[in-house]
Swiss-Prot record:
Ligand for members of the frizzled family of seven transmembrane receptors. Can activate or inhibit canonical Wnt signaling, depending on receptor context. Required during embryogenesis for extension of the primary anterior-posterior axis. Regulates convergent extension movements and hypaxial myogenesis during gastrulation via activation of non-canonical Wnt signaling. The gene is wnt5b. The lineage of its organism: Eukaryota, Metazoa, Chordata, Craniata, Vertebrata. Keywords: Developmental protein, Disulfide bond, Extracellular matrix, Glycoprotein, Lipoprotein, Secreted, Signal, Wnt signaling pathway. GO terms for molecular function: cytokine activity; frizzled binding; signaling receptor binding. A lipid is attached at residue 227 (O-palmitoleoyl serine). Residues 1-21 form the signal peptide. This is Protein Wnt-5b. It comes from Danio rerio (Zebrafish). Palmitoleoylation is required for efficient binding to frizzled receptors. Depalmitoleoylation leads to Wnt signaling pathway inhibition. Glycans are attached at residues 97, 103, 295, 309.
Length: 363
């Protein structure tokens, strides 16, 4: 009897350890590189702990890539930070506003759900890495890449030169794919399982984010000639402003496709009346949780205490933002520049004005 009980306790303990370790794998993410400053390779101190062993949230494959490309890690962190900031900007007027909760899981349990919001977060963070690494190549910060070697566009006028130092989007795309997707490709879940569906979802959204940066990159040119006559132009490939990438992905979020896993272990549309998603589209497998109220299980932070716009009928309006709970009004001082004048030559001088304004927060 005692032996059976001990075996039962042992089995329960092992089960709990396995479950907790799986949760830890989900919770820890390379996104945490955005939350903690990364030491640049040239700043290493003799006898200090190696860089890659200090970084939390990396999978086994990502840690190997870290060891091979240590000078890239700063820019992966910068890319993750860029993605998080853009996520917070795009969702600043939504019930879920891309809030970070800690330095390890970054977004908390809300990312355990395969929702539209999770899809956007994966896409925009992958896009951030492409953006940061591509630019670092152009600036000569990385040992394995340089200026863009993209082919001359066919529609570029013959008398325009092609060959300025452009952003190396090809390299940024390839490296981001290897690094960001490494965690997903290491997983070996049973084909057709819920976990397998989530892995496929993550890979699709990572690719959509990378493709957004790749496809939005455009040709930039500079004029040469006497007195700016522009008798000659030099052109190169340039990244789009990341705000444009964020807006593009936000549109993809609004039109994201609901998917499910089929018997063959592939994602398929829940509603066959819609066109299947392309490589540039976002997909999700779970409905979004209720973001109105705080919920420890789903990771929702709720909207209590959020600022709202009393006169707006949109998502930032008090009626929708506060989920019908009502709102409180208070007065606060607003400081801003005013009475600005241009002085010759050449600066603008402003006064600092203070006004008392009404603000509204959700109950």
């Amino acid at each position: 009897m005692d032996v059976r009980m001990n075996q039962g306790h042992l089995l329960l303990a092992v089960t709990l350890i396995v479950c907790n370790s799986q949760l830890l794998v989900v919770a820890n993410s390379w996104w945490s590189l955005a939350m903690n400053p990364i030491q640049r390779p040239e700043m290493y101190i003799i006898g200090a702990q190696p860089l890659c062993s200090q970084l939390t949230g990396l999978s086994q494959g990502q840690r190997k890539l870290c060891q091979l490309y240590q000078d890239h890690m700063v820019y992966i962190g910068e890319g993750a930070k860029t993605g998080i900031k853009e996520c917070q900007y795009q969702f600043r007027q939504r019930r879920w506003n891309c809030s970070t909760v800690d330095n390890t899981s970054v977004f908390g349990r809300v990312m355990h759900i395969g929702s539209r919001e999770t899809a956007f977060t994966y896409a925009v963070s992958a896009a951030g890495v492409v953006n940061a690494v591509s630019r670092a190549c152009r600036e000569g910060e990385l040992s394995t890449c340089g200026c863009s070697r993209a082919a001359r566009p066919r529609d570029l006028p013959r008398d325009w030169l092609w060959g300025g130092c452009g952003d190396n989007v090809n390299y940024g795309y390839r490296f981001a794919r290897e690094f960001v997707d490494a965690r997903e490709r290491e997983k070996n879940y049973p084909r057709g399982s819920v976990e397998h569906a989530r892995t496929l979802m993550n890979l699709q959204n990572n690719e959509a984010g990378r493709m957004a940066v790749y496809n939005l990159a455009n040709v930039a040119c500079k004029c040469h000639g006497v007195s700016g006559s522009c008798s000659l132009k030099t052109c190169w490939l340039q990244l789009a402003d990341f705000r444009r990438v964020g807006e593009f992905l936000k549109e993809k979020y609004d039109s994201a496709a609901a998917m499910r896993i089929n018997r063959r272990g592939k994602l398929e549309l829940v509603n066959n009346r819609f066109n299947p998603p392309t490589g540039e589209d976002l997909v999700y497998i779970d409905p979004s949780p209720d973001y109105c109220l705080r919920n420890e299980t789903t990771g929702s932070l709720g909207t209590q205490g959020r600022l709202c716009n009393k006169t707006s009928e949109g998502m930032d309006g008090c009626e929708l933002m506060c989920c019908g709970r009502g709102y409180d009004q208070f007065k606060t001082y607003k400081h801003e520049r005013c009475h600005c004048k241009f002085h010759w030559c050449c600066y603008v001088k402003c006064k600092r004005c203070t006004s008392l304004v009404d603000q509204f927060v959700c109950k």
